[in-house]
Amino acid sequence: MPFSVSWGILLLAGLCCLVPSSLVEDPQEDAAQKTDTSHHDQGDWEDLACQKISYNVTDLAFDLYKELADLSQTSNVLVTPTSVAMAFAMLSLGTKADTRTEILEGLNVNLTETPEAKIHECFQQVLQALSRPDTRLQLTTGSSLFVNKSMKLVDTFLEDTKKLYHSEASSINFRDTEEAKEQINNYVEKRTGRKVVDLVKHLKKDTSLALVDYISFHGKWKDKFKAEHIMVEGFHVDDKTIIRVPMINHLGRFDIHRDRELSSWVLAQHYVGNATAFFILPDPKKMWQLEEKLTYSHLENIQRAFDIRSINLHFPKLSISGTYKLKRVLRNLGITKIFSNEADLSGVSQEAPLKLSKAVHVAVLTIDEKGTEATGAPHLEEKAWSKYQTVMFNRPFLVIIKDDITNFPLFIGKVVNPTQK
């Protein structure tokens, strides 16, 4: 039986913090909006191959979501598909033969249509676009390799991961599992502003290499948001469970669409710096229908069907997270060899056979009233509110957040319980 050194890959798709902006006008912010040059970046994404890869990753987003949702119908779901795709695409640089093919095809890429070099080139452009200095999206991306002190990596692998994926490499002693765990966790805490702590809970002494990939997102709504008041209201987790949660109440004009095929309301919120969130609220007992029928093409059709309407919106404050061991999920998507003794990672290191033993993914989503302005006289307001359609996000709903420049999906998830961490 050949000797096999297992190593862990830690996929961190860190913080998504959706913070509505205040009503206080910021002259610099308004000027920046008027002179926002980010639309000039659109030309970078006229490349049909890169557009195709964005479609592939969006399809992967729905695949990942459905796999994770099937694991538990009673828990929140949150995943960052672009982060997962980039981490495994980067890892594929060190794989060969069937292991490499399986990873890239598992990411929904058609290798007969798209050259492998183009895949990495497009992901490089995604990283550059998401890190563009002129954006006020406040989105930070990065990755780091933690390499066992006794292990020498192939130079071309280090060079390619640094050039294409801006990856760093740090030496670490995995034999001292506590020290290694602390070093990785400190790195994650620092890069995410301590929003994600104690990510790594266990490490094996035979771990040789770990990959940490993260996305940190802090968005401001373009439309000035005003919470007339925050009320504690019921949220229907399921048919038998109702919890009390703070609800942000707002009467205003929104991009909203009533989708009959999905039996759902779809609310769009645009963010300063070119990102859009879609909140999809199915009718009671229709979540199964939404999950079954929602596809990327359907979402595209919805984006062309939005109306600007005045509604009375009730939206819960929430802070949810998702932590997943991706091994089972990726196996269901056809990525299996890299987890087995048949894995070919000789492009990473030629010192000993390697296989992937751990793949952990973490995402965090927060929505609250920070930066909003509360107003008085709620009883007078309520008279006016009765004239408008009320849309209450008081039951499970989906959320999809995408980057408008690259069209890559940043987050996809389901809110089942706004209070469930």
From Swiss-Prot:
Impact reported for residue 330 to P: In allele V1 and allele V3
Signal sequence bounds: 1-21
One GO cellular component, as annotated: endoplasmic reticulum
Source organism, top-level taxon: Eukaryota
Disulfide linkage: none
UniProt xrefs under PROSITE patterns: SERPIN
Tissue expression remark: Expressed in the liver, leukocytes and testis. Also detected in brain, colon, uterus, esophagus, spleen, trachea, kidney and lung.
Mod. after translation: Glycosylated.
Pfam families attached to this UniProt entry: Serpin (PF00079)
Cell compartment(s), UniProt: Endoplasmic reticulum
Alphabetical keyword list: Endoplasmic reticulum, Glycoprotein, Protease inhibitor, Serine protease inhibitor, Signal
Key word Endoplasmic reticulum present: yes
Sites annotated Reactive bond: 385-386
InterPro entries: Serpin_CS, Serpin_dom, Serpin_fam, Serpin_sf, Serpin_sf_1, Serpin_sf_2
Transmembrane portions of the chain: none
GO molecular function annotation: serine-type endopeptidase inhibitor activity
Glycosylation sites: 56, 110, 148, 274
Primary location group: endoplasmic reticulum
Keyword Glycoprotein: yes
Functional note: Putative serine protease inhibitor.
Entry comment, domain topic: The reactive center loop (RCL) extends out from the body of the protein and directs binding to the target protease. The protease cleaves the serpin at the reactive site within the RCL, establishing a covalent linkage between the carboxyl group of the serpin reactive site and the serine hydroxyl of the protease. The resulting inactive serpin-protease complex is highly stable.
Family under the similarity heading: Belongs to the serpin family.
Subunit note: Interacts with CANX and PDIA3.
Protein name (record): Alpha-1-antitrypsin-related protein
Species assigned in the record: Homo sapiens
